[in-house]
């Protein structure tokens, strides 16, 4: 499985992470503060055309915890 790390869990990073998880990638997000806590507690939610879908996602503020990655998006 392809391992992908995305720095930033805002609108763009979150959208990309959601799409990549749905495609079967092993995605991790680097986030801070309230975003990090929300991802850890509730997962990643995408709301599109009135429909919401929540997926579990790995999230950390310490990239070293993730180990080697195939791709890093920053």
Regions picked out by a protein language model, each given a short descriptive name:
Residues 44-61:
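N-terminal glycine-rich dinucleotide-binding loop that anchors FAD/FMN and/or NAD(P) in oxidoreductases
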């Amino acid at each position: 499985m392809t391992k992908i790390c995305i720095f930033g869990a805002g609108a763009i990073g979150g959208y990309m992470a959601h799409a990549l998880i749905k495609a079967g990638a092993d995605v991790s997000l680097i986030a801070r503060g309230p975003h990090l806590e929300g991802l850890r507690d509730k997962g990643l939610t995408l709301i599109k055309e009135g429909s919401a879908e929540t997926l579990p996602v790995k999230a950390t503020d310490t990239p070293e915890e993730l180990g080697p990655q195939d791709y890093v998006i920053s």
